[in-house]
Design a protein with these regions (language model features):
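Conserved catalytic-core segments of large NTP-driven translation/proteostasis enzymes
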Residues: 1
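ABC ATP-binding cassette signature C-motif
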Residues: 4-187
Length: 187
């Protein structure tokens, strides 16, 4: 089952968002209110502003005009197209424990080690340094760290990039029971 923090009444509200790069208008007067448990898929051609919209929601990019209101109980988790910088000398288990030792579930709690096993890092790999992982394993580890932070709004920017089939199946199973909002494309 998935984990996530409680989501209050106010979630994420976009009001009259406008964003351009040079002469290219990506969004004009875009308004949307995300509701509890929404599953929102953003579609569009390459370069149409899908990632920019996600970055605006996350606060990584400012709109040219309009407002983004984030509710007080909202905890965003943003899985970007690029991995965050990882300390290659850290052990896998320590990287995850830096996010959380345990995460709460509706049935109790799950340890960082148990979550690592669930995401295909057996105990024999958990004390390996990050520098020894493959690119795909680092991507999976980055995803797990975001999930360990117990977000209730999960933004997945091209989550299928560099994830193997097993990890995609795990992610889909996780999202089936995720008790919050999911915003994504290409899943």
């Amino acid at each position: 089952e998935s984990i996530g923090s409680r989501l209050g009444r106010t979630t994420v509200e976009l009001k009259d968002i406008c964003k351009s790069y040079g002469d290219k208008v990506l969004m004009k007067d875009f308004t949307y209110i995300f509701l509890k448990n929404d599953r929102v898929g953003i579609i569009g051609q390459n370069g149409s502003g899908k990632s920019t919209l996600m970055k605006i929601i996350a606060g990584w990019v400012q709109p040219d005009s309009g407002t983004v209101e984030i509710g007080q109980t909202v905890k965003l988790g943003y899985f970007s197209q690029e991995n965050e910088a990882m300390d290659e000398s850290l052990k896998v288990i320590d990287y995850i424990r830096n996010a959380a030792e345990y995460v709460k579930t509706k049935d109790g709690s799950i340890s960082a080690s148990q979550m690592l096993e669930r995401f295909l890092f057996p105990s024999s790999m958990q004390y390996t340094t990050i520098g020894k992982l493959s690119g795909g394993e680092k991507r999976r580890l980055y995803l797990l760290r975001i999930l360990m932070e117990a977000p209730n709004v999960l933004i997945l920017d091209e989550p299928t990039n560099d994830l193997d089939i097993q990890t995609l199946i795990l992610l889909e199973d996780y999202l089936d029971t995720f008790p919050g909002i999911v915003i994504t494309f290409r899943l």
